[in-house]
Each structure stands twice: as C-alpha cells, then as structure tokens.
C-alpha cells in the first residue's frame, strides 16, 4: 500500500533515513516506512544473490579432461567419441555459464550431438554417464514412439515431460538438463523423394523435433499424452537443454561409399574396397545423413557427429571386468552377499564376448548371457551351505552346463554334473 500521511511531519525511510520529500514514494508498513530507492536496492541484491547461486553451480563445471576421465571409469573404448562428447558438453555448459549481461555482441549457439554406432556400442551409457558426471537431470526417449501431431503415438513434448519429471518438476533444473533420443535413424524419410503418402513417424517428427532442438518455449501437458484445449500446461524453455541423438544408421556405409565412389573414379576396385566399415563411418558428412533421410534443417541443428566403433572380443572382455560397475564385479558382489566367491575363467569371458557378437547385441547383451549361466546357481546357492565358490567356465557358456561348484575345502562337489 502506498501512503503519505500529510498530517505527520518528518516522515522518513526506516532504512536510509531520507525524508519523504527527498524520495519519489514512501511505502508505509506496520510502524515502518521504506522508500522507492531502498526497494530498488533490495531488488538488485536479491537478483545478484540468485545469479551468484547459479554462477556458483556452474563454476563446478569439470574440464573436458575431467569429463573424459570420469567417462573412462564407466565406458571402455570409444576414445574418439568420448573426447568429442567431453568437449561438446563442456562448451555447452560453458555457454550457459556465459549467459547474462553481454559484454559484447557475440552470441554462442547451442551444439547438439549425434552418436552413430551399432546396437550395444555404448551410446546410451555415454549419455547417462555424462549426466551423472555433471549432476544434471537426464531423460531417455525412443524416437520410434513419436508421431507428428494428430496421429496415434507420443507428441514430441512428452520427451520434455520425462526431463521435467527427472528434475522433480523443478523447471529451472530441467532447462539445463540432457535428453537422449535413441533410434533417431528410424525417423528418417523412407526416401529422398517427397511422397504423397503421409510419413507420420518420419519427416513430420523431424519437423516437430526441430523446434525443441533449436530452442523454443514449449507447452507440456503435465500428465503426458495429447494436448487438450482447456488443459493447464507446463512452460519450459528448451534453449539450454542439450540433446544427444543416437542411432545405428544401418546401411549408411553404402551411402558414404556412393559419395566416395564419385571421387575414386580411375582407381581399381580394390582401391575403393579398402574402406572398411569403421573407416567409412569416420568419413561421414552431413550430406550422407541427408541422403539417408534426415532433412537439412534437422541436420543443421546437430552439428557434432561422433562415431562409435563396433566392439570386438577384447573390448567386450574389458567391459566385463574393468569399469567401476563392471558386470563381473556386480555379480561377484551379489554372490558375496551369500558368502560365496564367484570366478570367471579367461576362456569364459571370451566365450561370453563371442556370444554377444554372434547375437549382434554388443555390450547390451552381456548381462543376459551371464544371467542365463547363473540363474540356477543364484536360485540354489542361498539354501546350499556347502557351496562356497562358483567358477564359470567356457563350457558353462558354450554348452550351457552348470558352473563348477566348490566347498570350503576346495573340493569340486558337482563333478558328475559338469561332465555330463
């Protein structure tokens, strides 16, 4: 309430002591007065403290090397992809840190990231580990579930709802989060030629995603699903949300070969054939993604492309044993809680890795293979006090026989079963 009491003399601001005729307005409270100048000063102090809190949070941003070191603890191999991600993520959050009063006219634009690699090569794990490293909200979405507005399926805004939920509905936190959109290659146009048939999960979805990739204020239904005219919406600005797009892009090697073929005319076929799959992917360019079916505007919003290599037996064995949360360590700990030691022979680790390659599941399939070999043991061991040690051998994996079981004195107690 604004009030001047003209019956009283010498009304003063209770904070700065100025008389009412020295200021524009004097606001009366319960026995106190505050002038417009002190109100402005208080407002500035509050804004500075809020900005300082944001700045302090961002000063904890790790360097690219520190990000890379943390990724190395959980993700084996894929050095080039990890380095590209570390630099891109560092620059992204440094850009957010720079936001505020502009000292010059240079505006740093957001750079979203595309991860291209086969199933089980570590795309999702890289994105998850990045979010944990930076302690920001993280959400995963599957592009195959998205359709353009008006068709059965999810609206692209539902991706943002998952991030908001991950941030416990703290919009400020969500606006600095990371969203990983998997299977992005599945929304490529079915052909480079525009068809009269509606491609409801292709170009239309790319157009819808385009808006949130480049930065917009989106209206998100708090309960998910389709929007309704009278529904209350959550407003979220996507300008500072980092999008990581992942996809296998099966067959893109042929697209790259066709492009390279235009430049190797006159050479022998052997010269052109020397490009193996990894070497081809290393030479991927925006025009290859366009030929695959992504629209130019969409590609322009994802300027950073990192390639993930197909994992070989050695890499998969390292994944089984080396990361902080390696599967072998997890299952060893699980049986340790029942006072049972678990061991994997080198041959068993090789057999697990070879089976994952055979199934074309990459690192993603390692857990299911181990689970298959241990399910009976994990069922029986808690009620069998004689077993103190379990050894997984190559025979266990390849022939689906029972692991070797030992008692406290080191005696093999299921010899007849393992040789059956």
Swiss-Prot record:
Zinc in keyword set: yes
Domain of life, source organism: Bacteria
Keywords linked to the UniProt accession: ATP-binding, Chaperone, Metal-binding, Nucleotide-binding, Zinc
Matches recorded under SMART domains: AAA, ClpB_D2-small, zf-C4_ClpX
Annotated Zn(2+) binding sites: 13, 16, 35, 38
GO-annotated cellular components: HslUV protease complex
InterPro entries listed in its UniProt record: AAA+_ATPase, ATP-dep_Clp_protease_ClpX, ATPase_AAA_core, Clp_ATPase_C, Clp_protease_ATP-bd_su_ClpX, ClpX_bact, P-loop_NTPase, Znf_CppX_C4
Binding annotation for ATP: 118-125
Assembly description: Component of the ClpX-ClpP complex. Forms a hexameric ring that, in the presence of ATP, binds to fourteen ClpP subunits assembled into a disk-like structure with a central cavity, resembling the structure of eukaryotic proteasomes.
Disulfide bond residue pairs: none
Residues of the ClpX-type ZB domain: 1-54
Family label: Belongs to the ClpX chaperone family.
Stretches of the chain forming a coiled coil according to its record: none
SUPFAM superfamilies referenced in this protein's UniProt entry, alphabetically: Glucocorticoid receptor-like (DNA-binding domain) (SSF57716), P-loop containing nucleoside triphosphate hydrolases (SSF52540)
Gene Ontology MF, one: zinc ion binding
Function: ATP-dependent specificity component of the Clp protease. It directs the protease to specific substrates. Can perform chaperone functions in the absence of ClpP.
Name of the protein this chain belongs to: ATP-dependent Clp protease ATP-binding subunit ClpX
GO biological process, one term: cell division
Entry keyword annotation includes ATP-binding: yes
Gene from which the chain derives: clpX
């Amino acid at each position: 309430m604004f009030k001047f009491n003209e019956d009283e003399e010498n009304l003063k601001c209770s904070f700065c002591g100025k008389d009412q005729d020295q200021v524009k307005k004097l606001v009366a409270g319960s026995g106190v007065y505050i002038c417009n100048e002190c109100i402005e000063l208080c407002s500035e102090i509050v804004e500075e403290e809020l900005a300082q809190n944001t700045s302090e949070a961002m000063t904890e941003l790790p360097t690219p090397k520190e990000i890379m070191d943390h990724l190395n603890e959980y993700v084996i191999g894929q050095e080039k992809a990890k380095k590209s991600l570390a630099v891109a993520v560092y620059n992204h959050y440094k850009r957010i840190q720079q936001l505020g009063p502009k000292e010059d006219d240079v505006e740093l634009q957001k750079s979203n990231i595309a991860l291209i690699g086969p199933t089980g090569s570590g795309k999702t794990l890289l994105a998850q580990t990045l979010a944990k490293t930076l302690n920001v909200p993280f959400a995963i979405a599957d592009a195959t579930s998205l359709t353009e507005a008006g068709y059965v399926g999810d609206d692209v805004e539902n991706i943002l709802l998952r991030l908001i939920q991950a941030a416990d509905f703290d919009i400020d936190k969500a606006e600095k989060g990371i969203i990983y959109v998997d299977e992005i290659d599945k929304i490529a146009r079915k052909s480079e030629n525009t068809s009269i048939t509606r491609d409801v999960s292709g170009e239309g979805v790319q157009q819808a995603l385009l808006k949130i990739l480049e930065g917009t204020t989106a209206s998100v239904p708090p309960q998910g699903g389709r929007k309704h005219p009278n529904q209350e919406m959550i407003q979220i600005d996507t300008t500072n949300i980092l999008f990581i797009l992942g996809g296998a892009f099966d067959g893109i090697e042929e697209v790259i070969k066709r492009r390279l073929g235009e430049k190797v005319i006159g050479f022998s076929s052997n010269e052109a054939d020397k490009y193996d799959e990894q070497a081809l992917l290393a030479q991927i360019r925006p025009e290859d993604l366009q030929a695959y079916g992504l629209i130019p505007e969409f590609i322009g919003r994802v300027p950073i492309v990192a390639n993930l290599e197909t994992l070989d037996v050695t890499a998969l064995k390292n994944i089984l044993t080396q990361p902080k949360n390696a599967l072998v360590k997890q299952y060893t700990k699980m049986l340790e809680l029942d006072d049972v030691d678990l061991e994997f022979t080198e041959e068993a680790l090789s057999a697990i890795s070879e089976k994952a390659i055979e199934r074309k599941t990459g690192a993603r399939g390692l857990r299911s293979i181990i689970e298959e070999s241990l399910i009976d043991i994990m069922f029986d061991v808690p009620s069998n006090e004689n077993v103190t040690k379990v050894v997984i051998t190559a025979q266990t994996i390849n022939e689906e026989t029972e692991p070797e079981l030992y008692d406290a004195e080191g005696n093999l107690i299921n010899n007849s079963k393992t040789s059956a």
